[in-house]
């Protein structure tokens, strides 16, 4: 990744904050992923445990470089909200009724309860030089990082969503 310094920088920031390479308690596993899109660079580290088919998300670390940053607190809030929406994506799916997508608004989405929200830590590493998004780029690496952590725990690759179709539920 030496030819992609922005990608590597957020990956390293997430890995450092997420204690990548440090031992975890028995039964807890990590996954990591990196993403570039919406004009930003982001990476995530997920920590999970799996008991049977129940997945417990213990911790999420998300690093974001959106270029210029006006409000670090607002960026952190957007990234954290992206995790909530990502959990919804992980566990639910769109349905078609009368030839239309049914889940067209928040009242029809399976938004997670507070009990399903993990500890979310953000690393904001704006470098300036460009204006990037902050909502979607936080959600994008979270899902593959979590799926990689499930793989580390179970040996089962998750290639399609929602997780419930793979036999998993959130603990």
Regions found by a protein language model. Give the residues of each.
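Cofactor-binding beta-sheet edge motifs in enzyme active sites
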Residues: 1-171
């Amino acid at each position: 990744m030496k030819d992609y310094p922005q990608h590597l920088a957020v990956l390293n920031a997430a890995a450092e904050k997420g204690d990548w390479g440090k031992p975890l308690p028995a039964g807890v596993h990590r996954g990591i992923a990196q993403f570039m899109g919406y004009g930003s660079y982001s990476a995530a580290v997920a920590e999970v445990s799996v008991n049977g088919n129940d997945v417990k998300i213990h911790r999420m670390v998300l690093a974001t470089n959106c270029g210029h940053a006006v409000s670090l607190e607002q960026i952190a809030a957007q990234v954290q909200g992206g995790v909530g929406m990502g959990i919804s994506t992980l566990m639910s799916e769109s349905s078609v009724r009368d030839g239309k997508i049914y889940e067209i608004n928040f009242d029809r989405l399976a938004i997670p309860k507070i009990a399903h929200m993990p500890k979310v830590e953000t690393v904001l590493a704006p470098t300036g030089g460009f204006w990037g998004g902050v909502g979607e780029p936080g959600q994008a690496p979270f899902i593959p990082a979590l799926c990689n952590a499930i793989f580390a725990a179970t040996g089962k690759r998750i290639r399609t969503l929602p997780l419930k179709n793979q036999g998993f539920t959130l603990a």
